[in-house]
Amino acid sequence: MQPLGEGDFTHLIPRLEADARAAGQPLRISGLTPEGAAAVRRAHPEFGIWRNRDYEDYVYRADDLRNLTGRRYQPKRNHINRFEAAYDYRYEELTPALAPECMRLEREWRAGHDSHAAELTAEQRAMQRAFDHFGELELRGGALFVGEKLVAFTIGSAINDEAFCIHVEKADTRYDGAFTIINK
């Protein structure tokens, strides 16, 4: 993540590289603003910088996700309708007590996705840390069950009174609409 605040942060990159090397990892910086990417490019032209759409943010109005009104959200409504017709489900508030089930679902999800193993392992570690410090980090989330099986969960936190950030969202895609329902 790009450091926050004013001023030039590029002088910190050698320290970040040393820290990554000590952890046996290559240095990866994500979440750069266009200005931050330009600063890194100027200070370290040897670095490769590219866009990864898999890590881009999606911004929705909370009311839009709650109500799903309009033509734009028709596909989401269709997913929800199919899910509700097909499954007897329940939604629960996410608590750290559900961590083992969430980690199991994450492992199942990861097994079905072709991606960079190091990135996925880092995500798994981050998820475990999030559960370990759930209260301290003021995290909130939801869990979706079909019968007794956890089929989706989400973890996030309030950015301010008007914005909420989803940090992790996983669903068993064999349950059509699970991602959409956990979002609602």
Question: What is the predicted function of each stretch?
Answer:
Residues 101-149:
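Short, conserved active-site entrance elements at the starts or edges of catalytic domains
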Residues 8-18, 175-184:
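Conserved acetyl-CoA-binding loop-helix of GNAT-fold acetyltransferases
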Residues 45-116:
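Acyltransferase donor/substrate-recognition loop-hinge adjacent to the catalytic core
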Residues 32-37, 76-78:
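Short, polar loop motifs at secondary-structure junctions
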Residues 36-47:
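Short, aromatic/basic amphipathic alpha-helical patches
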Residues 1-7, 13-14, 162-172:
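Conserved acetyl-CoA binding element of GNAT-fold acetyltransferases
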Residues 22-34:
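Conserved GNAT acetyl-CoA-binding A-motif
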Residues 139-184:
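Aromatic (often tryptophan-rich) hydrophobic motifs at membrane interfaces
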